[in-house]
């Protein structure tokens, strides 16, 4: 199957159609930028400034520490951190040591964490002191061998580093003297063992850099194997698309979580490669973000619709100057047209929608920032990327405006799923990645999402898998049947709703089910609404009609 690539005629002259295939490691971009911009600020974190030389030095210290403690090439290291300097240092440090970074969400429950770490066969976990109880549980279960603990205060400037412990609501005591193989990040940084570091030989095309966990139709998380070449190719595509910038001179607002592959590529790797300053925020708070933009003047602001909506709806918006922002690439969920228009009016910059998935490192499409863009569209394929609409009915590529499954091809497409050859074969066919998203392409090569083939709920930029939520709630003794679906939400795009049938004579209310769900699921996966029914709509063979429930919900939403 070969597409005609009509989108190339729409490319601005500054964007190349094809890019050279990168044949170097991911960590080489840090080495290169540290050589070009040694004294330039790479990270700004609540007043703390770290240069590119600082980041490289600390990453090499961590790499040496990991090797001295037994890490071998290909060993998996879980990085369970919010956006902070240690996240960046850990990422490149693990890569310098020859390890594989396992992206781990700090919001995971112990149950979710255990599954991922067992599946990836992780040997080391790097995490916050506040998350130590989860980490030590994994060590007690013999899932991980070593724990590396850090604190937000480790990279705060004086006097914030002194005051921070006093403001913590949660106090965690860690006895480092009596517990073997538990180390502090700070002590690691004090050791001068970089001369002991042996940089392993890496094959960028085949060696895995990152295991990025994602779900599927079954809800069972799978490790997406992303090679050095996969991620670096996507980073270079990002640089080519965002061409109207000056290397070493931009500031990027780092709110999108780096444990999400979008933040990893479009913020962290992109900024490191081009010598940009990253202004890091561990979590999104609308007022704090407005203050940061007003004070630090970021020029680039990758995000998700919920972030932009949160800023636009804040009552104090008019008191802050957002005019420094030149361009924003929105991902993770559909960007409402009115949000795009209002945000561009407030900032004077450009806000465009893109599209991607973990299996593609992640970006495959975006609207042109300095060129034609179509509100409601996910845009055109990036350089060196092919895309098409596949018709299941004909087994051929669909014509313009014909609906089908979006398929993509390019150097950013994953190597496969970790230890799951059958699932890999199901989505990688004849060189194409079958995304599971349904849509169409217009005559100019702009693509549109029409529906989610997988019943994934995208709420606030997070992917939530109904089956996973259903299975967690099915453990409640009062539940007979349950189906979870994404329903319209003006802020999050979609939100999680559970339709429940209780066992005869059993009793349970919303509060009880909510508490039960919170004990088993990360907060963003917990249903925000419950509807109790006597029965659920089903087919003749007993399959629950999720689509029927969604249609009813959509009708009710429109009526409201």
Curated annotation (Swiss-Prot):
Domain of life: Bacteria
Signal peptide bounds: none
Magnesium listed as a keyword: no
Pfam families per UniProt: AMP-binding (PF00501), AMP-binding_C (PF13193)
Keyword ATP-binding in record: yes
Xref: Gene3D superfamilies: 3.30.300.30, 3.40.50.980, Luciferase, Domain 3
Gene Ontology molecular-function annotations: ATP binding; long-chain fatty acid-CoA ligase activity
CDD domains noted in UniProt: FC-FACS_FadD_like
Catalytic activity entry: a long-chain fatty acid + ATP + CoA = a long-chain fatty acyl-CoA + AMP + diphosphate
Keywords linked to the UniProt accession: ATP-binding, Fatty acid metabolism, Ligase, Lipid metabolism, Nucleotide-binding
Membership in a protein family: Belongs to the ATP-dependent AMP-binding enzyme family.
Protein name: Long-chain-fatty-acid--CoA ligase
Biological source species: Bacillus subtilis (strain 168)
């Amino acid at each position: 199957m070969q597409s005609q690539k009509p989108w190339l005629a729409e490319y601005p002259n500054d964007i190349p159609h094809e890019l050279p295939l990168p044949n170097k490691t991911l960590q080489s971009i840090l080495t290169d930028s540290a050589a070009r911009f040694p004294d330039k600020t790479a990270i700004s974190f609540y007043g703390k400034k770290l240069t590119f030389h600082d980041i490289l030095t600390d990453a090499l210290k961590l790499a040496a520490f990991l090797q001295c403690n037994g890490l071998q090439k290909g060993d998996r290291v879980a990085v369970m951190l919010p956006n902070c300097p240690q996240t960046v240092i850990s990422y490149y440090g693990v890569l310098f040591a020859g390890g594989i970074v396992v992206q781990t969400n700090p919001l995971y429950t112990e149950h979710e964490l255990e599954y991922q770490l067992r599946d990836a066969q992780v040997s080391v976990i790097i995490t916050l002191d506040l998350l130590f109880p989860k980490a030590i549980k994994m060590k007690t279960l013999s899932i991980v061998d070593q724990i590396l603990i850090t604190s937000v205060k480790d990279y705060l400037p004086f006097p914030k580093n002194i005051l921070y412990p006093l403001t913590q609501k949660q106090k965690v005591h860690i006895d480092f003297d009596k517990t073997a193989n538990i180390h502090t990040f700070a002590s690691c940084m004090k050791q001068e063992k970089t001369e002991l570091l042996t940089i392993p030989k890496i094959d960028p095309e085949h060696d895995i850099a990152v295991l990025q966990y994602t779900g599927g139709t079954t809800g069972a998380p799978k490790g997406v194997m992303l090679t050095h070449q996969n991620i670096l190719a996507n980073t270079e595509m990002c640089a080519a698309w965002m061409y109207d910038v000056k290397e070493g001179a931009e500031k990027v607002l780092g709110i999108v979580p780096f444990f999400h592959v979008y933040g990893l590529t479009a913020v962290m790797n992109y900024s490191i490669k081009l010598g940009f300053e990253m202004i890091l925020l561990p979590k999104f708070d609308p007022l704090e973000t407005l203050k940061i933009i007003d004070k630090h003047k970021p020029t680039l602001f990758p995000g998700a619709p919920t972030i932009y909506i949160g800023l636009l709806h804040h009552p104090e918006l008019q008191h802050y100057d957002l005019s420094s922002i030149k361009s924003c690439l929105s991902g993770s969920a559909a960007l409402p047209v009115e949000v795009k228009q209002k945000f561009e009016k407030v900032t004077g910059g450009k806000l465009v929608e893109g599209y991607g998935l973990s299996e593609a490192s992640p970006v495959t499409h975006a609207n042109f920032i300095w060129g034609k863009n179509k509100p409601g569209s996910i845009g055109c394929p990036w350089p060196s990327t092919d895309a098409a609409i596949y018709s299941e009915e004909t087994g051929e590529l669909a014509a313009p405006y014909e609906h089908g499954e979006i398929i993509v091809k390019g150097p950013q497409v994953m190597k496969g799923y970790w230890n799951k050859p059958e699932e890999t074969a199901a989505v990688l066919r004849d060189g194409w990645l079958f995304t599971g998203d349904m849509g169409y392409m217009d005559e100019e090569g702009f693509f549109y999402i029409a529906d989610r083939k997988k019943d994934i709920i995208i709420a606030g930029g997070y992917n939530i898998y109904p089956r996973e939520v259903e299975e967690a709630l099915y453990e409640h003794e009062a539940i007979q049947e349950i189906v979870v679906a994404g329903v319209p939400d003006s802020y999050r795009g979609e939100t999680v709703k559970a339709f429940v049938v209780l066992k005869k004579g059993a009793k349970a209310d919303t509060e009880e089910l909510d508490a039960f769900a919170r004990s088993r699921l990360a907060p963003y996966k917990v249903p925000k609404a419950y509807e109790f029914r006597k029965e659920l709509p089903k087919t003749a063979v007993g399959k629950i009609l999720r689509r029927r429930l969604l249609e009813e919900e959509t009708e009710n939403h429109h009526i409201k």
